[in-house]
Amino acid sequence: MHGNVPTLPQYIIELIPQTEIDLQCHEQLNSSEDEDEDEVDHLQEQPQQARRDEQHPCYLIETQCCRCESLVQLAVQSSTKELRILQQMLMGTVELVCPLCATRR
């Protein structure tokens, strides 16, 4: 920088695009093995998908930290009956603590 006031040309030295970058991928894959692996992965995903479909919905609980009163979010996946039990516990003596206060003890 020369002088008391910085100017834009002092900071922009060279704006020349690089055209020499090779964007071609020279990697070669064995296609028959990849297809076999894809089929195995697909078969393994089917039972997991069925389990996900049977699972209960996810609920987001927002409350305040019992120590610093910052926002605490808790994601819960449960049945309606068990969610009511959690609600009763939170309305009672169970209180949530934010991660920052939990590390302070």
Curated annotation (Swiss-Prot):
unnamed ZnF: 65-101
Region (E7 terminal domain) location: 1-45
Motif interval(s): LXCXE motif: 23-27
Motif Nuclear export signal, residue range(s) on this chain: 83-91
Domain comment, as recorded: The E7 terminal domain is an intrinsically disordered domain, whose flexibility and conformational transitions confer target adaptability to the oncoprotein. It allows adaptation to a variety of protein targets and exposes the PEST degradation sequence that regulates its turnover in the cell.
Signal peptide: none
Source species: Human papillomavirus type 53
Functional summary from the UniProt entry: Plays a role in viral genome replication by driving entry of quiescent cells into the cell cycle. Stimulation of progression from G1 to S phase allows the virus to efficiently use the cellular DNA replicating machinery to achieve viral genome replication. E7 protein has both transforming and trans-activating activities. Induces the disassembly of the E2F1 transcription factor from RB1, with subsequent transcriptional activation of E2F1-regulated S-phase genes. Interferes with host histone deacetylation mediated by HDAC1 and HDAC2, leading to transcription activation.
Gene3D superfamilies named among the record's database cross-references: 3.30.160.330
Keyword flag Transferase: no
Localization per record: Host cytoplasm; Host nucleus
Main location: host cell
InterPro entries tied to this protein: Papilloma_E7
Top-level taxon: Viruses
GO process terms (BP): DNA-templated transcription; symbiont-mediated perturbation of host cell cycle G1/S transition checkpoint; symbiont-mediated suppression of host innate immune response; symbiont-mediated suppression of host type I interferon-mediated signaling pathway
Subunit structure: Homodimer. Homooligomer. Interacts with host RB1; this interaction induces dissociation of RB1-E2F1 complex thereby disrupting RB1 activity. Interacts with host EP300; this interaction represses EP300 transcriptional activity. Interacts with protein E2; this interaction inhibits E7 oncogenic activity. Interacts with host TMEM173/STING; this interaction impairs the ability of TMEM173/STING to sense cytosolic DNA and promote the production of type I interferon (IFN-alpha and IFN-beta).
Recorded family membership: Belongs to the papillomaviridae E7 protein family.
Post-translational modification: Highly phosphorylated.
Pfam families: E7 (PF00527)
GO terms for MF: DNA binding; DNA-binding transcription factor activity; protein domain specific binding; zinc ion binding
Entry protein name: Protein E7
Annotated GO CC locations: host cell cytoplasm; host cell nucleus
UniProt keywords, alphabetically: Activator, DNA-binding, Early protein, G1/S host cell cycle checkpoint dysregulation by virus, Host cytoplasm, Host nucleus, Host-virus interaction, Inhibition of host innate immune response by virus, Inhibition of host interferon signaling pathway by virus, Interferon antiviral system evasion, Metal-binding, Modulation of host cell cycle by virus, Oncogene, Transcription, Transcription regulation, Viral immunoevasion, Zinc, Zinc-finger
